[in-house]
Structures are given as C-alpha cells and as structure tokens.
Amino acid sequence: MTAISDPDLALRDAQKAIQSGDFATARQITDALLAGEPTHKEALYMAAVCARYEGRSADALAHLDALKSLSPDFGRAYQEEGHLKRKLGDLSGAVGAFERATRYNPALMASWSALADLYHQAGNTDAATNARAQADRVRALPRELQAVTNHIHEGRVFRAEEIARAFLQKHPTHVEGMRLLADIGSRLGVQEDAEFLLESAVDLDPDNVQLRLDYIQVLRKRQKFAAALEQAGVLMARDPDNPLFQSHFAIESMQAGDYETALDHFERVLQKIPGDPATLVSRGHALKTYGRTEEAISSYKAATDVAPGQGDAWYGLANLKTYTFGDDELARMQAQFAALDIDHMSRVHIAFALGKAHEDRGDHDAAFLAYAQGNALKHQTVRYTTDQMHAEFDAQKAICTADLFEAQAGKGCPAPDPIFILGLPRAG
C-alpha cells in the first residue's frame, strides 16, 4: 500500500469523499493512513464513519474501541458510537453514547439532536426539551465560537485561543466569546485574566447563569472563597429552591469553612433529588473534612449503592486512609472497572481504590497492577509533553541571562523578610 506523504491533505480528501458518498475512496485513504500510523485519531474516526455507512458494523466498533482507548475523552468517538448503536437498534446504548459525547464535547449538535429524539421516543419529555434547547443554543452560536468550543474540547486550546481573540477583537462585548476565552485562560492556568473576563461578562449580562457559574469556579481556583460564596449567594437569591444553585452554595460554603451551612444545603438537594450520587459524594467530602468520619463513610457508601460506577465515591472511601474495603466491595469495584459503559475518570478512580483494597490485603502484586492501570488511564487524558516543557526551559535560559539580571540591579523590594512560597502540595 502506498505511503501517505501528506496526512492532513489525505484526511481532507477522505472527508470530501465521505461527504460525497464515495466511501470506497475514503476507506482506501484511511486504510493507507492507518497502515502507516495505526494510532492516528482522525483516521480512526473517519474509518469508523466509513465502516458504518458501508454496513461493516464490527469494523466500525473495532475502530471506535481503538480510538476511545487512545483518547477516552474524544467526544466525536462517542457520537459516532451513538449513530452506530442507533442504526443497530440498540437505543439504550445509543443514548449512553450520545450522553458521553455531549459530556466530553458540548458543541456536538448532532448528539444533542439525537438525544432529543431518543428521549422523546422514550417518553422523557423534560430531558428531550433540555437536549433540544442545548442543540438550539449551539446552533445559535456564531460559527467562530462553535469552532472555539470544539477546539477546546478536543485539546486544541491554542488554536481555540487564536479564534476567540480574533472574534473578540470584532465583538469585544460578546459575553459567550468572553466566557470561552476565560475558559481557555483557566485551562492554561492564567486564572487572573479569566477572572477579569468573567467579572466583566457578568457585569454585562448579570442574568446569565452559566457565566456566573464559571465565575464562581475561577474564584474558587484563585482561593477567593468568600467572593465565590458571595456569587453563589446571588444565584440562591434568584431561585432559592433550585437544587443546582443549592449545590453550588453548599460547595462554596464548604470551601469557606462553614460546614454546617454546607451540610444543610446538601440535605436540601437530597430532599429534592433523593439518592443523587454526586451530592452524596460532596456531602461525604464535607463530613470527612468536618471530622465526622463515620457519617462520611455512610454517605460515600450510599453513593456506591445507587451508582456503583461512581468512581469518586469509591476513591473517597479509599482516600480516608483508615477505611478497609470488604470482599463484596472489592468484587463490586472489580466488576465496575471491567464494565464497558463506565466513565473514564470513574475507571481511573476505581483503579486507585482497587490498589488500596489489594494493598490492605497484602496482595502487593495486585495493588501495583491496579495503581499502574490507574496511572496509565489517567495519562491518556494528560496532554503534557516533555517537548513543550523543554521548549519553555530553553526559552527561559535564552532570555533570563546573567546580563538581564545585572541590568536590573538595585530594583525590587529591599525588605529582608523571608519569602514563603505556599500552595505547592507535595513539593517537598
């Protein structure tokens, strides 16, 4: 098979072939690409699309399994899985796939629209209405911001930043553009800029709930807990009975050290949504920090009872350090770790909890295997590269020379006080 000299050009040709219905040509291109680079994500994705249209369901599933293994948070892989399962009549599986697709990439209009149809068929009117509203929201975005959202959630953050900045130069007060650029800044660790953008956007559109939720998150990341709690209070004043707002108010109260208020509001959420696993886990965290360990254990275990795949609940139990898993719990965690439809981060959390369970039993080989699996799974979602870090170090060495510092002699603060650098967990 002839090697592909320009993979990007070949992918564009494959995409054009798919769009024109020439799946044979598209298949030839993707086969050639994968022969030279079996882990090429876009080639695997297009190969799966071709296989679905050509009726080669087993091949499509194989390509998607490989793609999800390489990139567990690649939303389009789950969207394609949803299309395939829907075609095969597995409507429940299709719903699960489309739900994961929108979780990993909320810009996928096709997934939202498919969910709206499938929810409607199942008689779930509220969920159908929400999914349709989400599809309409994405559709209404300027095309540039649709692209920004897609780039963000497929890991191309710098490309997303370029488009967002260019858009805001033309539309400087577009609050969704400001929100997306703040999201990019937060992902890149530039929290101060993100805070300024969101504060400005909230001033422009104070009734925009998503803006304020993002603002709260950035304030928390900057450890401005009182300010985050104040913003959560604004949402609570707007709709005191809204469980989403109650949950955020509880979380910010916990961060601010007011555990009684936090626990009270977690209970209010659970009264409206009994057995909500995320709230049970959050309540467990609050109880643990408050020193009420036995109640924390009960809350975590309640979460695993209603949602056995809730990985952070199992991890919460393990992270207590003093909790010992029973044999039945070990078996349940092993079953969930092997389940096909579990979220990726839940699988990561369960792997580490399994490591703790095996370690407590003295089965060190099994413990090391579980820890290794957890680290390998986590590594799949980490886009860190040593090349990037080396480039940053080289740039610092090139710019920050002895001459640079000598030229700045005499500047700075003359105070002799020692400087303590805080906020570096495990730095020692």
Residue map of PLM features:
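Register position in tetratricopeptide repeats
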Residues: Q19-S20, Y53, K87, Q121, ...
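Helix-start (N-cap) detector for alpha-helical repeat units in TPR-like alpha-solenoids
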Residues: P7, F23, K41-E42, G75-Q79, ...
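TPR-repeat structural position
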Residues: F23, S57, L91, T125, ...
